[in-house]
């Protein structure tokens, strides 16, 4: 069952969006590697005070989560991650 990564909601009140942790040039790579989370559209993804697109701390936590997940699943070092995504978030 899908739930919001930030607040835990199941999306019954505010529909869930798929948020690619590493966007822009890395969006397709995020999709392929499963580096995405579900977020409530209004409150946690786009418009809320702590939403991924409005709050630097939330975005940093997402990037750190994505880096740890990809490093664990691919048995990468920090240097391997930087080669793939261009930056260290941890």
Regions found by a protein language model. Give the residues of each.
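Histidine-centered catalytic micro-motifs
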Residues: 16-24, 41-47
